[in-house]
Amino acid sequence: GNLKNRITKGSWHVENIVKVDEKARVVYFLACGMDKNENPYYDHLYRVNLDGSGLKQLTKKDFFHEVTMTDDARFFVDNYSRVNTIPTAELIDAATGSKVMTLQTSDFSQLFAAGYKFPEIFKVKAADGITDLWGTMYKPFDFDSTKVYPIIDYVYPGPQVEATNYPFTRMTPRTDRLAQA
């Protein structure tokens, strides 16, 4: 077919089309990298009219979002977190981005009672002095700033998957284990 019109443009990445509401002439999509002050890997849900007008971010800033939309595109469940926050699930109105209700906030009380501490997110400049590099630092739970610790640079340089977790997931603790060793 022929291109009718461009719907989005900009120096950011569309990750996934979540839903096309043909009746309302709206597309919902996950994208990252729009906010230059935020980790560029945090996915956010947006809506935009099929003619390219009315672009609106529907999810909270500065979190990684995983969303599931209802079949009628009226609501979505937003599971959001970072590696240094407690995961939360909310029901959101898809037209406005307004919270309808909190569905669940994870209970970390036993983790914290056992000494768990969140990792630290950081941003540094690359050697070019321009490019921002984002990372996560895991420290021993009994970290002592007067001691010297080895650094483990946990990198996966392949194109298939990132080695860094952005939301708090079941995989997050595996990196914590290295810091505790």
Question: For each of these PLM feature ranges, what is it?
Answer:
Residues 24, 64-181:
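Serine-hydrolase catalytic core recognition
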Residues 30-33, 140:
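Short regulatory "switch" loops immediately downstream of catalytic or recognition motifs
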Residues 36-41, 82-85:
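Short, solvent-exposed loop/turn segments at conserved positions within beta-propeller repeat blades
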Residues 1-23, 32-37, 48-65, 94-118, ...:
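Multi-bladed beta-propeller domains
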